Amino acid sequence: MPLRTLLCGLLLAVCLGQHALAASRCSERPRTLLRPAEVSCSYQSTWLDSGLVGQRKIIYQTPLGTPPAGGWPVVLIYQGSFFPLNDFSYHSNLPFGGYYEGKLVQNLLDHGYAVIAPSAPADLFWQTNIPGLAQAYELSTDYDFLGNVLAAIASGHFGPLNAQRQYATGISSGGYNTSRMAVSFPGKFRALAVQSGSYATCSGPLCVVPDQLPADHPPTLFLHGFVDAVVPWWSMDLYYDRLLHQGIETARYTEPLGGHEWFAASPGKVLAWFNAHP
């Protein structure tokens, strides 16, 4: 093969490879002196019934490209208190490390995971640890709503998704709600990642983890700041230790100087955890 032909072929392969890597639902803008950094991903929206209070909004997106034979694996991301996910646009000056939540959405979409972000009641907080409802969760509108979200995934409402490969993550109230998936939706999730949260019924320093957790509790990753003043690190550790004691797969990442926030390390660690549990 002539050298010129070989070089042209190599150049074409490099260009095509770069184009494939560049294809994304998301765009980024670097930080400047006058503007914060931004990551923004396109999204779709829909509404589903949540029982007595009517419908709630869900935003979602599927990856680019052709889905695998069984459909895209899917990650449910649960909002923290008072910070609704109205879109997938995030700036680096957001509180609680919100920018890194955006990087997580980007990372998941770019690596073949669909992302679904349901809304908490009135965009406020999840009912998983509200006194009264925490002990009778099946009476909550969250239970109705999230059951409808899971049914919609299975029916193809969000596109070609794989209901056998469902994952969940979230921060703060959304972290507690991630734990709720293990308690009230058994067998539905392959793995969980709890950011700055703990067991489903805990609330900040008010935290008692049951002596016996569900035997089919999904593998769970915890990401927590050691100096978190909202959800103390030790409250997460109670949950982590209980999983270890029962022989349930778990892992823990501690940000030594981290507070109540997403971390720069969060997107990569959550993706790796989900990848490890296909």
From Swiss-Prot:
It is an enzyme of class 3 (hydrolase). The keyword Secreted applies. InterPro entries: AB_hydrolase_fold (IPR029058), Plant_Biomass_Hydrol_Est (IPR050955). The keyword Hydrolase applies. Its EC number is 3.1.1.76. Keywords: Hydrolase, Secreted, Signal. Residues 1-33 form the signal peptide. Disulfide bonds: none annotated. Transmembrane segments: none annotated. One of its GO terms (molecular function) is poly(3-hydroxyoctanoate) depolymerase activity. It catalyses: Hydrolyzes the polyester poly{oxycarbonyl[(R)-2-pentylethylene]} to oligomers. It comes from the Bacteria. GO terms for cellular component: extracellular region. It is found in: Secreted. Hydrolysis of poly(3-hydroxyoctanoic acid). PANTHER family: FERULOYL ESTERASE (PTHR43037:SF5), UNNAMED PRODUCT-RELATED (PTHR43037). This is Poly(3-hydroxyoctanoate) depolymerase. It comes from Pseudomonas fluorescens. The gene is phaZ.
